[in-house]
């Protein structure tokens, strides 16, 4: 409905250009918003106020001219001017009912699909050789929810798990394995089963022994030179580390697979060419022995240019080098229209610089969109980054296990007579969903406080509340036998039916925001509002005890659409639904 009103306004603006009311080359981003007050209609635009300056007319006069020029539409019951020149649209109830009717048998719930694009999504991307920790949660689940929404809307999505599988940490691990094998022979392999402790011990040796650190750096050079022994061990480290990652992904219900892994090492062969190409274009400068690029747009507080370091004085490459190689690959090989990077907000300057440089060096097509969709940090209840009681990093697997234990206690307290197998399965879904939803429901760019107590509450905008809301709606159909809604028609008579219908009709608009802005929190807010709208409808409008069959079937269709929308919305967030709780 919103896109329909936008189309009417676009046609009106085109007519204004033809009549000379506004300049022919005038470009306006027409904004149509949902109204908060029903007395102001369903949708509103400030187009008249946007045109005031170029048209040389006062906004209320322009608003009336817009209304007079609008093409006729069966969807619009009436149009009014409000305040200084807002235009309010009242949607025809029968048109809304028709829109909902079309959604009933449509797998996309009546959503008009956009023109499909190829979208590369870079997310999760942990450094290997260590277990995943809570710092990896946000990129992993925010990226995955946006991927799901993109695919649902018909886009071709290419997941890229740009793991940190190269660099100094591997020299450290190789040197430590070398020491262990010198002492214990092949038995040293067993110590790799606990990768985290193995890494910690190697790091301790690296920090304490200059001789060990020198050997570690030497092994990095040997690894990069293709030494067979070093490469064999490196592959073992990676395989063990990736196995840990995919155990976590499976538990989180994240859609990444081994086939999506395209880490730093995948671009090793391209890095030298990146340097040569930048040099050939005259973009490289030498600074303290390193090869760097300075761009006029990037300066520090003192006004000094900020470098993008491409190659260190010792010949080593940096993140910027592999990122540039990856961008070129994603543009030229993957043919991406958009590339989305779900990486911590603290990397904002890095991405601004490399995006700018990639365009400047023509490593990427001009029409390819590079987007850093950064996020804030997950903090403990003290407001500081989330840590263990001893101050260490919290392993993601430990966090999920605690969520499961707490969810099991909660579910058992509410269902003392339920069998253990059912309790365990419900707790698994509730625990994981609570952790994911608590994160996804927060604005991506904000920091947030992690609280098990809040996220496991059955009140407010939480996963348990929404999971229960879904079971409540779906439960209506368990009380109906021989249900046949094939001939049923949606009719919106009661005010609460209209409110629910209006909310259901917004699903497509919400998903557009999720994929355009990378903002799953707007979907969470929508699902919470939808659950509330259904609750108000259910209290005011008897469904199974409706006045007649036509009314009952209409309300059953509204309930069915609500259940499907809640389920689809939660699934797009990567959250399973339950049939009972």
Curated annotation (Swiss-Prot):
EC numbers on record: 6.1.1.19
Span of the annotated motif 'HIGH' region: 126-136
Swiss-Prot/TrEMBL catalytic activity: tRNA(Arg) + L-arginine + ATP = L-arginyl-tRNA(Arg) + AMP + diphosphate
Pfam (any one): DALR_1
Compartments where found: Cytoplasm
The entry's keywords: Aminoacyl-tRNA synthetase, ATP-binding, Cytoplasm, Ligase, Nucleotide-binding, Protein biosynthesis
Taxonomic superkingdom: Bacteria
Primary localization class, coarse: cytoplasm
Keyword check for Ligase: yes
GO molecular function (one): arginine-tRNA ligase activity
GO cellular component terms attached to this protein's record: cytoplasm
CDD domains given in the database record: Anticodon_Ia_Arg, ArgRS_core
Any one Gene Ontology BP term: arginyl-tRNA aminoacylation
Subunit structure: Monomer.
Family: Belongs to the class-I aminoacyl-tRNA synthetase family.
NCBIfam families: argS
Name of this chain's protein: Arginine--tRNA ligase
Lineage: Bacteria, Pseudomonadati, Pseudomonadota, Gammaproteobacteria, Alteromonadales
Gene: argS
């Amino acid at each position: 409905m919103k896109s329909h009103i936008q189309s009417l306004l676009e046609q009106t603006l085109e007519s204004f250009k033809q009549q000379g009311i506004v300049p022919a080359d005038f470009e306006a981003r027409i904004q149509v918003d949902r109204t908060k007050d029903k007395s102001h209609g369903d949708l509103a635009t400030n187009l008249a106020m946007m045109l005031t300056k170029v048209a040389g007319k006062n906004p209320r006069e322009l608003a009336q001219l817009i209304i007079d020029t609008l093409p006729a539409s069966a969807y619009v019951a009436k149009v009014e001017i409000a305040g200084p020149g807002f235009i309010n649209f009242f949607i025809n109830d029968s048109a809304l009912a028709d829109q909902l009717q079309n959604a009933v048998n449509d797998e996309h719930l009546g959503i008009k699909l956009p023109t499909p694009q190829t979208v590369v999504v870079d997310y999760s991307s942990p450094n290997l050789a260590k277990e995943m920790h809570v710092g990896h949660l946000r990129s992993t689940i925010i990226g995955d929810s946006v991927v799901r929404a993109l695919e649902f809307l018909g886009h071709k999505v290419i997941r890229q798990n740009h793991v940190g599988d190269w660099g100094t940490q591997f020299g450290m691990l190789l040197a430590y394995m070398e020491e262990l094998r010198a002492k214990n022979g092949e038995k040293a392999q067993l110590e790799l089963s606990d990768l985290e402790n193995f890494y910690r011990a190697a790091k301790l040796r690296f920090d304490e022994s200059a001789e060990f650190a020198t050997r570690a750096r030497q092994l990095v050079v040997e690894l990069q030179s293709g030494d067979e022994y070093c490469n064999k061990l490196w592959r073992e480290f990676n395989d063990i580390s990736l196995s840990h990652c995919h155990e976590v992904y499976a538990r989180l219900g994240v859609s990444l697979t081994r086939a999506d892994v395209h880490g730093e090492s995948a671009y090793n062969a391209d890095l030298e060419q990146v340097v040569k190409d930048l040099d050939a274009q005259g973009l490289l400068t030498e600074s303290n022995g390193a090869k760097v690029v300075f761009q006029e747009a990037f300066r520090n507080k003192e006004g000094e240019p900020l470098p993008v370091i491409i190659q260190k004085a010792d010949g080593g490459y940096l993140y910027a080098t592999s990122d540039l190689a990856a961008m070129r690959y994603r543009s030229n090989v993957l043919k991406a229209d958009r590339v989305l990077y779900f990486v911590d907000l603290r990397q904002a300057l890095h991405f601004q610089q490399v995006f700018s440089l990639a365009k400047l060096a023509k490593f990427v097509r001009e029409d390819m969109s590079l987007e850093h969709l950064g996020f804030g940090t997950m903090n403990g209840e003290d407001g500081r980054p989330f840590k263990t009681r001893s101050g260490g990093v919290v392993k993601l697997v430990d966090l999920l296990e605690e969520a499961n234990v707490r969810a099991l206690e909660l579910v058992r307290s509410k269902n003392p007579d339920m069998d253990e197998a059912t309790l365990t399965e419900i707790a698994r879904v509730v625990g994981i969903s609570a952790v994911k939803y608590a994160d996804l429901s927060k604005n991506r760019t904000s920091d947030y406080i992690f609280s098990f107590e809040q996220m496991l509450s059955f009140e407010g905008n939480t996963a348990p509340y929404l999971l229960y809301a879904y079971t409540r709606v779906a439960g209506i159909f368990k009380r109906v036998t021989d249900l046949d809604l094939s001939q049923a028609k949606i009719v919106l008579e009661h005010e609460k039916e209209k409110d629910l219908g209006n909310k259901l009709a917004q699903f497509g608009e919400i998903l557009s925001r999720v994929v355009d802005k990378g903002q799953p929190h707007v979907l969470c807010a929508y699902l919470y509002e939808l659950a509330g709208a259904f609750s108000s409808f259910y209290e005011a409008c008897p469904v199974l005890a409706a006045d007649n069959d036509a009314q009952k079937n209409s309300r059953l269709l509204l309930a069915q659409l609500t259940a499907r929308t809640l389920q689809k919305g939660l699934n797009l967030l990567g959250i399973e639904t339950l049939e009972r709780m």
